[in-house]
């Protein structure tokens, strides 16, 4: 069966932004204008199509990325029909993981900013993630009808705070309640959308006289940006100072695809102005699956390889999200990078080493589904019937095995103990938590060995609230939740050499493992700029510790790292070098050397000046000027370090670094200080040493 839409007419895009920039409303309008939903769902009515979980509709925020397929032929029907697969991503910092997963499988993104608040903390996080995956993007400055909205100010903020080369392709006509429409800088015409039909039709009129000069200045900057795409365009521009509309599109597209520039559009999704122009921008400037570099992967032997985006290549797809559906059970969302998959086909999962059969394939529209017979390169769809797949697994052809890059997921920073309200629910709770953990890799579940309690960990208080809420609604398990606990870590501060000997020789075969290990602080970071946890170096010469036991020493040290040495918290930032030792021909074993390794760390870390680390959060508080002093005083009392201040239309913005341990219940507190007018957001920044008096308390409570 041939393809319905040619691959170059595909656009796999994400819509990402900070909470409240109007991202879900923008997506709703896209679905309305592309003809998918006949009635527009408003977020503040709790009726948005993409926000399909009950909690999302109650809280008015998007938690999980819903995926939707839609079609667009242009505002003036000027394009052939393009297929747009859209992923709507959450903007709350506790759900960064959902954004990370979506960006991993997208080819392009529309980043939405609020016209009055501009660049906010989550916008920076999203931008960093998009940079990490090299995702070309365009910007939509939304809410131009809001008080304090200023398109050019937001573009300037994107330049300075996100270090992005922003090129406006539009200019707003009026702002706040006078926002009327936009100037198209390529056609040099004003676009006025018709309010009677919710912006379905529009007229092109002359540019208002008072904006003519500014529009011409911005047009020149835009043409210069387009001309820099190639020598031919630059020559033509230098000779005549002008480029045709097609040449401008061609130049801008080439530079967006190379991640050299970011085009800026503006409008108000809520007022039905500007969204169709953004759709034209998606088709014109964002890449098709075969216009981005071939996906990198590895063969089974760990050799680097790549897969072109083509139906003729062997099948390869990435499972980027799991969801539990009340009617069909487990849904596995996949992005197909190459080849074709038909329902009923068997696929191989090289990460698990298992073969599975795909029962049915469905195309999702938020939480409604259409069954389809097959998916091809470039498609995003959900499979039903896969049992043993986790987020980040590769699915491929068993005859041609590849492993697509693994996704890196952040470590949780907050934990709470949960217990079912009735003993009868214990098993139900275990099943529910297991399913939720399979869906969300930034959520972890473990049993505390000492207390026997179930401990759940995640990215923030809201994240864990929603998990407990979903247990109640979807799995009918009522639970009691303990006070939040901080995910402390331990590390060492100095270099030490440690001998450890494990010897058991009392009749029969004994045990003998003897090692000398040098421990020192590890100051290395991984490719994401995060501190490395552990590095093991083998410097043994002359076979004093036989090759087959060296891995066991490393394993023993690594297992002991998980238990810590001061207060039972996992250790990070440790480099261990095995440089000497001895063995016994008969009594030595892998187990003996593993125990010797763990003994070496236990003894050595105490001498190496071990200390406790705590998560430090980057906190941004927006407060009216009147409450500035009180809010800053409160942050100082919480051991906060004020890093700087900015202004924005709603008041002052305080940037601070504050220990997570001091931030519990802050939301209620900051509301009462400011009579409900201040808001804040926070994300994990780094681990730092805990002050001695607090470290003593932590150790004391662990030992008691």
Swiss-Prot record:
Residues 8-290 form the tr-type G domain. The keyword Transmembrane helix does not apply. One of its GO terms (cellular component) is cytoplasm. GTP binds at residues 17-24, 88-92, 142-145. It comes from the Bacteria. One of its GO terms (biological process) is ribosome disassembly. It holds the Pfam family EFG_IV. It is found in: Cytoplasm. One of its GO terms (molecular function) is GTPase activity. Keywords: Cytoplasm, Elongation factor, GTP-binding, Nucleotide-binding, Protein biosynthesis. PROSITE patterns: G_TR_1, G_TR_2. InterPro entries: EFG_II (IPR041095), EFG_III (IPR009022), EFG_III/V (IPR035647), EFG_IV (IPR047872), EFG_V (IPR035649), EFG_V-like (IPR000640), EFTu-like_2 (IPR004161), G_TR_CS (IPR031157). Catalyzes the GTP-dependent ribosomal translocation step during translation elongation. During this step, the ribosome changes from the pre-translocational (PRE) to the post-translocational (POST) state as the newly formed A-site-bound peptidyl-tRNA and P-site-bound deacylated tRNA move to the P and E sites, respectively. Catalyzes the coordinated movement of the two tRNA molecules, the mRNA and conformational changes in the ribosome. Belongs to the TRAFAC class translation factor GTPase superfamily. Classic translation factor GTPase family. EF-G/EF-2 subfamily. This is Elongation factor G. It comes from Francisella tularensis subsp. tularensis (strain WY96-3418). The gene is fusA.
């Amino acid at each position: 069966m041939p393809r319905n839409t040619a691959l170059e007419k595909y656009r796999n895009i994400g819509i990402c932004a900070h909470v409240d920039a109007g991202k879900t409303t923008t997506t709703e309008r896209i679905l309305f204008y592309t003809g998918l939903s006949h009635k527009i769902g408003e977020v503040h009515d709790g009726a948005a199509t993409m926000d399909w979980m009950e909690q999302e509709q109650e809280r008015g925020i998007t938690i999980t990325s819903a995926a939707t397929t839609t079609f667009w032929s242009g505002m003036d029907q000027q394009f052939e029909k393009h297929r747009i697969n859209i992923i709507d991503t959450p903007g709350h910092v506790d759900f960064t993981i959902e954004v990370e997963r979506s960006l991993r499988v997208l080819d392009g993104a529309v980043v939405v900013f609020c016209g009055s608040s501009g660049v906010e903390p989550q916008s920076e996080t999203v931008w960093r993630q998009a940079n990490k995956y090299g995702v070309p993007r365009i910007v939509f400055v939304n809410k131009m009808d809001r008080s304090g909205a200023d398109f050019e100010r937001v573009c300037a903020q994107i330049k300075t705070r996100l270090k992005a080369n922003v090129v406006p392709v539009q200019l707003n006509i009026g702002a706040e309640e006078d926002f009327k429409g936009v100037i198209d800088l390529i056609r040099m015409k004003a676009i006025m959308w018709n309010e009677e039909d919710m912006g379905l039709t529009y007229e092109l009129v002359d540019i208002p006289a008072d904006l003519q000069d500014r529009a011409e200045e911005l047009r020149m900057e835009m043409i210069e940006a387009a001309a820099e795409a190639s020598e031919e365009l630059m020559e033509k521009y230098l000779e005549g100072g002008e480029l045709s509309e097609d040449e401008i599109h061609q130049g801008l597209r080439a530079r967006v695809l190379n991640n050299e520039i970011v085009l800026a559009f503006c409008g108000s999704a809520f007022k039905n102005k500007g969204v169709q122009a953004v759709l034209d921008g998606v088709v014109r400037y964002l890449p098709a699956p075969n216009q981005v570099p071939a996906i990198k992967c590895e063969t089974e032997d760990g050799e680097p390889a790549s897969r072109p985006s083509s139906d003729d290549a062997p099948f390869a797809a990435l499972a980027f999200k799991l969801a539990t559906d009340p009617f069909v059970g487990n849904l596995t969302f996949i992005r197909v990078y190459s080849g074709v998959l038909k329902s009923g086909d068997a696929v191989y999962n090289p990460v698990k080493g298992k073969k599975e059969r795909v029962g049915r394939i469905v195309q999702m529209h938020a939480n409604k589904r259409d069954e389809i017979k097959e998916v091809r390169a470039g498609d995003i769809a959900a499979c039903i019937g896969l049992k043993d797949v986790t987020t980040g697994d590769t699915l491929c052809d068993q005859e041609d095995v590849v492993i697509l890059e693994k996704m890196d997921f952040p470590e949780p920073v907050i934990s709470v103990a949960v217990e079912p309200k009735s003993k009868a629910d214990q098993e139900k709770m275990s099943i529910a938590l297991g399913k939720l953990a399979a869906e969300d890799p930034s959520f972890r579940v473990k049993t505390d060995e000492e207390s026997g309690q179930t401990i759940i960990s995640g990215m923030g208080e809201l994240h864990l609230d929603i998990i407990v809420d979903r247990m109640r609604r979807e799995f009918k398990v009522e639970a009691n939740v303990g006070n939040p606990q901080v995910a402390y870590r331990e590390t060492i501060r100095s270099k030490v050499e440690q001998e450890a000997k494990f010897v058991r020789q009392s009749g029969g075969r004994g045990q003998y493992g003897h090692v000398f290990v040098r421990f020192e602080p590890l100051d290395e970071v991984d490719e994401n700029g995060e501190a490395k946890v552990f590095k093991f170096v083998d410097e043994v010469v002359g076979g004093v510790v036989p090759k087959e036991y060296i891995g066991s020493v490393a394993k023993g040290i690594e297992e002991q790292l998980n238990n810590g040495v001061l207060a039972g918290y996992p250790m990070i930032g440790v480099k261990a070098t095995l440089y000497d030792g001895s063995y016994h021909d008969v009594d030595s074993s892998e187990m003996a050397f593993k125990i010797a390794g763990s003994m070496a760390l236990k003894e050595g870390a105490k001498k190496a000046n071990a200390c406790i680390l705590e998560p430090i959060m980057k906190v941004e508080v927006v407060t009216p000027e009147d409450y500035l002093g009180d809010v800053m005083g409160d942050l100082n009392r919480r051991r906060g370090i004020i890093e700087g201040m900015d202004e924005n239309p709603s008041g002052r913005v305080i940037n601070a670094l504050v220990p997570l341990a001091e931030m519990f219940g802050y939301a209620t507190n900051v509301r009462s200080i400011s009579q409900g007018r201040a808001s804040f957001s926070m994300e994990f920044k780094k681990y730092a040493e805990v002050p001695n008096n607090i470290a003593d308390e932590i150790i004391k409570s662990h030992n008691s």
